Amino acid sequence: GVRLVGSEMCIRDRCKNTFTSREGFGLFGIIQGGMFETLRKKCSEKLSKIGFDGYALGGLSVGESHEEMIKSIDFSLENIDEDKPRYLMGVGRPIDIFAAVERGVDMFDCVLPTRFGRNGRAFTSNGEINLRNAIYLKDDSPLDEGLDLYVSQNFSKSYIPVSYTHLTLPTIAVV
């Protein structure tokens, strides 16, 4: 673990020295170290000294609990300048995103919301639901009465899966 973090730093240092700055582009250092506080702190400290345009947190959302992820985010960001962009890789559950934003994370990317949508699932203020379950087939209540969003208030739980099917079938037929 420690030797790997050290060898990765050599590569990152060379990468930083080789990178040619261009308008609209930035080079991010990726903080690694699994669930090990000492490795993540060491990695973030060394990356901060190298000085990147932003910092990404990698190696999270791979089976650890929400609490373990939050702890890892906390000690990963201890040495990172607050004025630099912070990017959390591969995290897509709302509870994780909200907790990360509270800790200063700025950017996210994840296939989870798209995958959930494709498979008839939705995130609501009451948790995740599967709109393909029989209980929602004739449920004309809004998707989420607790959210003041257009979709949440104007489309029912029964309408969303039907509309998705009607929108995707012509595309599939063309392909």
Language-model-derived ranges and their functions:
Residues 144-167:
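C-terminal extensions of enzymes
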Residues 15:
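PLP-dependent aspartate aminotransferase-fold enzymes
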Residues 9-10:
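Active-site loops and adjacent core secondary-structure elements that bind or stabilize anionic groups
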Residues 1-6, 166-175:
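Single conserved hydrophobic/aromatic residue that forms the stacking wall/gate
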Residues 90-92, 160, 168-171:
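Alpha-helical hinge/cap motifs
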Residues 18, 22-143, 147:
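Glycine-rich phosphate/ribose-binding loops and adjacent secondary-structure elements
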